[in-house]
Amino acid sequence: MPKKPSRKTIVNNLDKVFSEYIRRRYAKNGIAECVTCAKKDHWKNLQAGHFMSRKHYATRWDEENVEVQCMACNVYRYGEQYLFAKHLGEDKADELLAKSRTMVKLKDWELQDMIEIYKKKLLELEQ
């Protein structure tokens, strides 16, 4: 019987498939654009930037909370929060802020289900 994956492994796997989905969802012919500075590059060279930090499970895998960002904006400019909020609009930014403050406890099987959902979504993007 295979060893049950650790919680950390499950979360990392979900982060990986979710990030790829976000970046590929916005790509046209493999090229995506940074939401904050408009830099265009291949989706593999860009990142999935979070408006509300990944530490908040309530919004960590919320598709409205995550957009394509270049490494400069996402890492070195701390996500360019002001420009990100401007892109989202005040109401959506406030909604995500409130949602991020809610307590969410996801079970391992729920995270595994989300992995399968995003794998299916990636397959749909390929068609």
Model regions: which residues?
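A boundary/linker detector
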Residues: 1-21, 26, 38-40, 96-127
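Residue-level detector of alpha-helix boundaries and kinks
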Residues: 3-7, 55, 73
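Conserved aromatic-histidine-acidic binding/catalytic patches
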Residues: 10, 58, 76
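Short metal-coordination and nucleic-acid-contact micro-motifs, chiefly zinc-binding Cys/His arrays
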Residues: 15, 25-33, 62-66
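Histidine-centered nuclease catalytic patch
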Residues: 33-65
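Short Cys/His-centered divalent metal-binding micro-motifs
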Residues: 38-42, 66-91
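Short microdomains enriched in Cys/His and/or Lys/Arg
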Residues: 54-68, 89-100
